[in-house]
């Protein structure tokens, strides 16, 4: 048996033989480097909270049902979710994203910096484009976590990146690298990946955002070849800052925003895996694609089947092997 064939079987079997169900904070990708990445995330999160110092009161003018109301909150501490807690339990459960001053999408768990108007967005608003885009982006982020959970360490899976959301394309995507050029997952393997997405949704994991300096991001991702290569270009476009997101212990790079929790993922299918380019003498880039509905949305089997078939078509997004500097909307979307 050739080395390439052995690698192929390793990655294939690694996906078929899924790790046992893990707790919220213990994905199968856990390792010393992952633990350190999370430690650094936690330390920086605490440092930023402690650096707030004197707490300034801000006025948040909530616009929406049941009525407009002004809330007095704590600047750089209170979040849109905290505002929702002052309104009702329903607002907390339904609000996927916030809109600040009528135009700025804002993560539900991101501290508000100054007085503003606030709208809480769900998937039933009259103009859902903004929240749908955040949902699509979150699906790609969750797919990275699901892939880490599904593949055993010996498969040597490496997450590359996920393109910005393109709802018209019919699929959300995540690009990966495997040390085999012959991976062709079957229905069983794709169902296993879909099941990992469903598990993430059931865990109702809060999605956290953290803006950090490039040097800290480099330290966090120093064991990730592709993330390390991408960070300088990202920070050049964002004044030396890098935006990170975390669910459970899975951390990745994205400018966001994303929806508040994994629980907003409803019916979901990981539908396709396309080899898009070779990487080195034995590896290859693969684009994993899927389609999903927000939780609470119902679609009959036939209609969802049409969406699933459409999502299998190769995504037109820029390919992961193209120079990162040219990918205008890749990780920065």
Swiss-Prot record:
UniProt entry tagged with the keyword Ribosomal protein: yes
GO terms classed as biological process: mitochondrial translation; regulation of translation; regulatory ncRNA-mediated gene silencing
Pfam family, one: TGS
Keywords carried by this UniProt record: Mitochondrion, Ribonucleoprotein, Ribosomal protein, RNA-mediated gene silencing, Translation regulation
Molecular function per GO: nucleotide binding; structural constituent of ribosome
UniProt subcellular location: Mitochondrion
InterPro entries assigned: Beta-grasp_dom_sf (IPR012675), Pro-tRNA_synthetase (IPR050062), TGS (IPR004095), Thr/Ala-tRNA-synth_IIc_edit (IPR018163)
GO terms for cellular component: mitochondrial large ribosomal subunit; mitochondrion
Record's subunit section: Component of the mitochondrial ribosome large subunit (39S) which comprises a 16S rRNA and about 50 distinct proteins.
Native species: Drosophila melanogaster (Fruit fly)
Family: Belongs to the mitochondrion-specific ribosomal protein mL39 family.
Name of this protein: Large ribosomal subunit protein mL39
TGS domain ranges (all copies): 56-122
Region span, Disordered: 311-333
Chief place where the protein resides: mitochondrion
């Amino acid at each position: 048996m050739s080395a390439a064939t052995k690698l192929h079987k390793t990655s294939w079997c690694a996906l078929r033989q899924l790790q046992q169900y893990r707790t919220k904070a213990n994905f199968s990708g856990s390792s010393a480097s992952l633990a350190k990445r999370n430690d650094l995330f936690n330390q920086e999160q605490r440092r930023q909270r402690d650096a707030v110092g004197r707490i300034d009161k801000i006025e948040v003018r909530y616009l929406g049902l049941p009525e407009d109301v002004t809330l007095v909150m704590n600047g750089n501490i209170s979040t849109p979710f905290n505002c929702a807690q002052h309104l009702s339990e329903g607002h907390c459960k339904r609000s996927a994203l916030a809109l600040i001053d009528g135009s700025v999408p804002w993560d539900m768990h991101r501290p508000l910096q100054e007085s503003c108007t606030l709208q809480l967005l769900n998937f039933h608003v009259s103009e859902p484009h903004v929240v749908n885009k955040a949902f699509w982006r979150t699906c790609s982020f969750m797919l990275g976590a699901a892939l880490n959970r599904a593949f055993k360490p010996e498969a040597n899976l490496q997450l590359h990146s996920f393109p910005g959301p393109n709802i018209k394309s019919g699929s959300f995507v995540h690009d990966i690298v495997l040390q085999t050029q012959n991976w062709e997952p079957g229905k069983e393997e794709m169902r296993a990946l879909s099941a990992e997405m469903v598990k993430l949704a059931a865990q109702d994991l809060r999605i956290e955002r953290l803006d950090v300096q490039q040097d800290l991001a480099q330290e966090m991702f120093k064991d990730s070849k592709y993330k390390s290569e991408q960070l300088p270009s990202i920070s050049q476009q964002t004044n030396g800052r890098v935006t990170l997101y975390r669910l459970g212990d899975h951390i990745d790079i994205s400018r966001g925003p994303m929806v508040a929790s994994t629980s907003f993922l409803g019916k979901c299918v990981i539908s396709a895996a396309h080899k898009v380019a070779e990487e080195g003498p034995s590896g290859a880039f693969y684009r994993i694609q899927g389609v999903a509905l927000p939780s609470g949305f119902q679609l009959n089997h036939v209609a969802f089947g049409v969406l699933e078939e459409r999502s299998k078509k190769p995504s037109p997004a820029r390919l992961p092997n193209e120079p990162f500097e040219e990918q205008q909307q890749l990780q920065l979307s």
